Design a protein with these regions (language model features):
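Extracytoplasmic gate region of multi-pass secondary transporters
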Residues: 135-189, 277-281
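Hydrophobic core of transmembrane alpha-helices in multi-pass small-molecule transporters
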Residues: 7, 22-38, 230-244
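Helix-to-loop junctions at the C-terminal end of transmembrane segments
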Residues: 190-202
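C-terminal ends and interior cores of transmembrane alpha-helices
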Residues: 4-19, 212-226
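Cytoplasmic helix-loop-helix junction between adjacent transmembrane helices
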Residues: 29-66
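Cytoplasmic membrane-interface "Motif A"-like loop-to-helix N-cap segments
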Residues: 4, 55, 199-211
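Glycine-rich segments within core transmembrane alpha-helices of 12-TM secondary carriers
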Residues: 56-80, 95, 267-281
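C-terminal transmembrane helical hairpin of 12-TM major facilitator-type secondary transporters
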Residues: 204-248
């Protein structure tokens, strides 16, 4: 947290930096902030999952992630209302410091305390995901479930301006707005995913039907007839709502593994998914260079991402109401 918040505040001071290239400085600071942020969601989800009764885990983790992902929306509005992008970094850094102060008073879960007291038990061992075939396959499936979220955010929203001409829209798309609307949908979807999971009494069914909902949105975004950029932003909300199972996906990852490596799973799985955006982007641009069609490129990448996610969702073990008091 300290690393992330200091890097954010430093980003707000960049206009006053004259001793080095501002782009290099910004890239370096965002990398540092990313390191500080990388494990926060997974650690928070793990703490909530281990602290709440199993009947309330889905609701609790969804609320945590739902409010957390609203940060991207608040940041965009902060810039628009203040007219100065540096203000968003100052506010974000200050809020992070406040969160750090609140975090000091949060107690560890009883399950974790029992494991941490056992000096003979291996804890937080990342290599352990690769020492067992069953555990490794389970780890890969957890990663695959999250791929559609970053396909929608990293390609359809972040690269929205790439699709303006091919979709014959009446105006240019703004990637910043596309991301903002997508995150509004994701935040709402995160809240809903917990409710849907409780209603269906299944993590797998909740994620599966949200994936189906997202696929419909992707097809409408890329193939339906419309000319207004506003409709593209509407579909960004749709895709965000569908891929709002992000909290549920991290929760499933946490629930799959024992207490001694649960936090490691919950922090590394979402980061592995984010990292998979690199090969997805590479494939996207490679197909464009071959076919010149951005829509076809998006469809190919999307088919791969959604196929892997659906297969993994259907074949991974159900964790609804699972007792988390176990070790690997």
């Amino acid at each position: 947290m300290c690393i992330r918040d200091r890097a954010n505040i430093a980003c707000g001071l960049l206009p006053h930096v004259n001793f080095m290239d501002k782009i290099t400085a910004y890239s370096t600071l965002r990398f540092i902030a990313g390191i500080g942020l990388a494990g926060e969601l997974g650690a928070g989800i793990t703490l909530v999952a281990e602290s709440l009764p199993k009947e309330l885990r889905a609701i609790g983790t969804s609320i945590v992630a739902g409010f957390g992902l609203l940060g991207a929306v608040v940041a965009n509005f902060t810039v628009e209302l203040s007219g100065d992008w540096t203000v968003a970094y100052f506010i974000g850094g200050a809020m992070g410091i406040m969160l750090l102060i609140f975090r000091i008073g949060v107690a560890e879960s009883g399950i974790f305390k029992e494991v941490s007291d056992d000096k003979t038990l291996s804890k937080g061992n990342f290599i352990s995901f690769f020492t067992s075939k069953e555990r490794f396959i389970k780890y890969l499936k957890c990663i695959a479930i999250g791929l559609p979220t970053w396909f929608c955010i990293g390609i359809l929203a972040f690269l929205a301006n790439e699709f303006s001409d091919e979709l014959n829209l009446s105006g240019k798309l703004n990637p910043g707005k596309a991301i903002m609307w997508a995150y509004i949908g994701i935040s709402a979807g995160d809240f809903l995913s917990g409710i849907i999971s409780q209603w269906l009494k299944s993590r797998k069914k909740a994620i599966f039907w949200m994936l189906v909902f997202t696929i419909i949105g992707v097809l409408l975004m890329l193939f339906s007839s419309y000319t207004s950029p506003s409709m593209y932003y509407f579909y960004c909300v749709w895709l965000g709502l569908g891929t709002g199972y992000w909290a549920m996906f991290v929760t499933v990852g946490a629930e799959q593994f024992g207490t001694n490596i649960r936090a490691t799973a919950a922090t590394t799985i979402p980061n592995m998914v984010r990292g998979m955006l690199i090969p997805m982007n590479f494939l996207f641009y490679y197909i464009i260079s071959s076919s010149s069609s951005k829509v076809i490129a998006a469809v190919v990448v999307g088919v791969i991402a959604f196929s892997l996610a659906i297969y993994s969702t259907l074949t991974i073990s159900e964790t609804h109401n699972k007792d988390l008091d176990f070790i690997e």
